[in-house]
Amino acid sequence: MDKKSPGQTGKDQRIETGVNRGKEIEIFITNHRVRASEGETIGAVLTAIGMRQVRHAPQLKDFRGLYCCMGSCYGCLVTVNGRPNERACVTPAQAGQQITLQEGFGRPDMASPDPAPARLVRREVPLVIIGGGPGGLSAAIAAANTGAKVLVIDENLQAGGQIYRQLPQTFQVEAPAILGSDYVDGRSLFGQVQELSNAITIWNDALVWSVGESNQLVVTRGNELVLLDAKSIVVSTGAYERPVPVPGWTLPGVMTAGGAQVLLKNQRVRPGRRVLLAGNGPLQLVVANQMLDAGMEVI
């Protein structure tokens, strides 16, 4: 990066062992040139260079940062190429992007061209599975083995869910064992899905907006609005954390355990060097172990 961006602190937090990152690109954050790799999200790039303060809420000085890292909380909204309110945690970095850290909810650039209207598509599907995590993929395999044709719909760029989160396709894995058992087990499950590719279709980066009467689903996928008439539907959407609000819970640098896990597993970026884990449940111990493996200090 040419010079330090506002709010940037510390060393680069990328974990370079075990993977070869995608092609190096340049993006611009508040007019500062920043190094990124194809496949990284904007949120991962911000975290890697130490920028915890992503925006402030409508109230001045109410600063916000990455929190859930899975697109659920909308706490990390940024403006990308003039388009406001993009979620930094799930928006891929692309060469030449102009990223502006927002004040409040941002305003659209009225001089920019209107996006093309969505194309309406309608089709019939025997079985739709909503969610491409371990449960959804296992259900798809079981159904396909009975001869059913299956469509799996997942909102992420890659299937796998929180447990089997995979690296971006632009990353080359050099040492799978370093990535942990979840990565290895996930690859095994994906291999089973691939063997049944004649029966299983996966739509990534697609959102199910509603399920109506007679099992009709409304799905957005790219620039398409898809109406699906399904004979059967399996809901396997997983879950996300709902933390108890405490004073300071929205401060930059505070995030959910699941959010930290996304950065570690999917982006190979440390959420920090020294971290305090607060809460209960088995996930805390799993994340603590993953943080230690990444060279972080857990206090």
What are these regions (language model features)?
Residues M1-R123:
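Signature of N-terminal electron-transfer/Fe-S-associated modules in redox systems
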Residues R33, L60-G65, I178, L207, ...:
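Conserved short loop/turn motifs at secondary-structure junctions
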Residues R35-E40, G65-Y74, I129-G132, G136-S138, ...:
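Cysteine-centered iron-sulfur cluster-binding motifs in ferredoxin-type domains/subunits
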Residues T41-V45, S138, M255-G259:
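Short amphipathic alpha-helical face segments that pack within enzyme cores
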Residues V45, P243-P245, V286:
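Short helix/loop capping segments that flank catalytic or ligand/cofactor-binding pockets
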Residues R52-H56, V269-P271, E297:
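A short alpha-helix-loop-beta-strand transition element characteristic
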Residues K61-D62, G82-V128, R165, D185-R274:
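FAD-binding core/adjacent interface of flavoenzyme oxidoreductases
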Residues L127-I129, P134-S188, P271-I299:
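Beta1-alpha1 glycine-rich phosphate/pyrophosphate-binding loop at the start
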